């Protein structure tokens, strides 16, 4: 049985990308090509390419599925009426005026009290707790105040304060549905010029929405993976996407998830017969080696943190030994890691397909 320690690997800190490249598609791409069935390092071949070369590895009638969520300026600093400092990170917008949020303070805020945010620009009212989160009520539409006064919530491993460059580069060019507190980072490598080349090659694309929560950075704290409680995120699948999947299957194309968030949404809505159900809801799907994929054939993804649930996910798709070999190669070749880093193209190992 695999344990948390099986997903650890040494990572020199200087390989953690601290800023995005000026040219989105100029990042590097590690292509992990499957040569044979079985989960061994010898069963795959690795090719070091530029991300813009991904067109060479896609086929006419392949379907790329993107997550169109938009990162909101979810972080606030402020104070309690007593003067004590608080930090608020919005996790989810519940309705026009209400959000779920993490609140950091020296003492737990009291239900009914006020938190004064953004240099006293406005105050929110503390509501009931929901697990580790607080409900907060905004005096005006929450998304308006978030956009006006909030700060971009860069991941904890990026050490600089967010600036105007981050506000552009920590969004995909197709982001349109506000609600995420972390970017679907595999999509950061795509630009309009690359989309034009994909169109010319006959590669199709479609979109879903999954609002990425801060739980994506939540560490796994138990060696026994079965004891880990996965965070929940809201997603929506349109009938247009469900139809695009049906057409792709009929034409013999592959369903390729752009990012782990797209993959998690697709697999959450996948039916036993391999079709995709339109609709919306919450997912806390936790994909680990041994999972049988119903829908996704391949994945475009960045490099993930040691011992993370996302490293477990890519290991389930491509194979534990294949991913170990790929990550060793990436470290040796000085790839850039995490949100602003480089990418991989992974194909599903045959043993991971649903019967």
From Swiss-Prot:
<dbReference type="Pfam" id="PF02547">
    <property type="entry name" value="Queuosine_synth"/>
</dbReference>
<keyword id="KW-0671">Queuosine biosynthesis</keyword>
<keyword id="KW-0949">S-adenosyl-L-methionine</keyword>
<dbReference type="GO" id="GO:0002099">
    <property type="term" value="P:tRNA wobble guanine modification"/>
</dbReference>
<keyword id="KW-0808">Transferase</keyword>
<keyword id="KW-0963">Cytoplasm</keyword>
<dbReference type="InterPro" id="IPR042118">
    <property type="entry name" value="QueA_dom1"/>
</dbReference>
<comment type="function">
    <text>Transfers and isomerizes the ribose moiety from AdoMet to the 7-aminomethyl group of 7-deazaguanine (preQ1-tRNA) to give epoxyqueuosine (oQ-tRNA).</text>
</comment>
<dbReference type="InterPro" id="IPR042119">
    <property type="entry name" value="QueA_dom2"/>
</dbReference>
<comment type="similarity">
    <text>Belongs to the QueA family.</text>
</comment>
<protein>
    <recommendedName>
        <fullName>S-adenosylmethionine:tRNA ribosyltransferase-isomerase</fullName>
        <ecNumber>2.4.99.17</ecNumber>
    </recommendedName>
</protein>
<dbReference type="GO" id="GO:0005737">
    <property type="term" value="C:cytoplasm"/>
</dbReference>
<dbReference type="GO" id="GO:0051075">
    <property type="term" value="F:S-adenosylmethionine:tRNA ribosyltransferase-isomerase activity"/>
</dbReference>
<comment type="subunit">
    <text>Monomer.</text>
</comment>
<dbReference type="InterPro" id="IPR003699">
    <property type="entry name" value="QueA"/>
</dbReference>
<dbReference type="GO" id="GO:0008616">
    <property type="term" value="P:queuosine biosynthetic process"/>
</dbReference>
<comment type="pathway">
    <text>tRNA modification; tRNA-queuosine biosynthesis.</text>
</comment>
<dbReference type="InterPro" id="IPR036100">
    <property type="entry name" value="QueA_sf"/>
</dbReference>
